[in-house]
């Protein structure tokens, strides 16, 4: 198949798999340019708050807050307000750790940019969401100094190439993910840092200061993260959050510089990943991006190959990783029983990650995806 045909086929699969029918319906009307009482009533008529996933309830609570003119039934209004209150209190402990770390880094001094959900908390303080940790980025030359300072404060690191993920003490409770670059799996990730820091603005966070990315960088990071979520088969909640964030930033387009987003994608080698993520968003929000944003990428054979790679990672690699569970081999030998099936899955993953393009397509065909 040609590039565009493959792209369309994969987008159809993703649209049906990633979000449930109820979630697609909710996004389509909740993020529409205008929301009517009739569309809300029609949705609520077949909606059961007891059966609905948490992210959908949160999106409805946002809708209630942004559209005070809409009338919600008495049976659901207290629950929707309660979700916002729950998220606000859930974040208190996390942000207490964040502000303590921010103050420490500012005293060194080490500049840091807050990313993703932490940044949205600053952009939209009245719209809390559940967060497991807060992502921050520092200059590469400051990374080890920042990591040592945070570790000296009693936080325990899980060390990766692009970040150290700090938990609270010896617990598994997340606190801060310290990045030297934002992972994109292109080998060019660090090229984003200079512009990201230069365009960010300083904001006060309790007893410390941090840098907040500009709107354009937030949109770029959201699209890259969406691509990762699609290929990694993460929960629909992360995808819903991306739609909410993009609607917030793209609904306020005055002075929005699309060239920054394009330049970020070019520098980091993520043009196709960003275009695919934008194309996925456009299946539900058709007017989110300007007509020329995707350019000719979607018609290229390269885009088709990237779509099949996304599908391979999502349907073949990610489920096997989830089945393996424990990634640290030494820890696995101490804790996993029986060990032989675990070893077999690790060997299988090793070879599946190293197959060529034709073999990957053949595996997808055998599974019925293409």
Q: PLM features: what roles do these ranges have?
A:
Residues 2-132, 138-370:
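Conserved NTP-donor binding/palm subdomain of two-metal-ion nucleotidyltransferases/polymerases, i.e.
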